[in-house]
Amino acid sequence: MKNIEIEGKKISFEVKSKDVRYVYLKLKPDFSLQVTVPRNRDVDINKILEKKRPWLEKKVREISQKIKIFDKNTVLYRGERFEIKTYYVKNPEKRIRLYKKVAFVYEDSNKKKEEILMEFLERETMKYVKERVEEFKNELNVTYASISTKNMKKWGYCTKDGKISFNWRLICLPERIADYIIFHELLHLRHFNHSKQFRSEMEKYFVDSKEIKKTLKRYYS
């Protein structure tokens, strides 16, 4: 891989030839750059990267402000970052314990750290969602068909027949943002769109809606 320095960061990039008409650039969260060029066509990559430098600088700044939900060493829980410490224990009584910003994970031959964390977060998300849904549905006077958690890119989704799904990582977010997402999906039971009336009701309950949406875009897994 070749490298280019943008905003003080070393960006590694690879070039792929595909059946496309134009050159495409994609900067990933790990600051690796994918350059796609038309097949069988001579392209001056360095010239293109210099031309796109202002765009790349903007993207690097945006990614630098993003908040990673969890990685090998840390995990977010209710908006707080916990250091992960893993121990191998035969037949552990508890799989995970949170104490003073540390997540103690007890794995064995049957379950590893990643699976334990995922199950814990999914369980905590469902518990939190159920509590908040019961409160918000009475506030909105709506009924739903079912509530579930899924592994998906969106934070939440509501179908026309009242089935609501939430991202199992929801519990990682600050409570104010998680509540916004839950309320947002429940409100779709009253307005199945993002009409002016829908937005007006959201802002009635969440006067900081614009700031919440802006902050939410910073979180990624």
What are these regions (language model features)?
Residues E185:
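Walker B catalytic acidic pair
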Residues I182:
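Walker B beta-strand of ABC/ABC-like P-loop ATPase nucleotide-binding domains
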Residues M1-D179, L189-S221:
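Active-site-proximal or metal-binding-adjacent scaffold patches in catalytic folds
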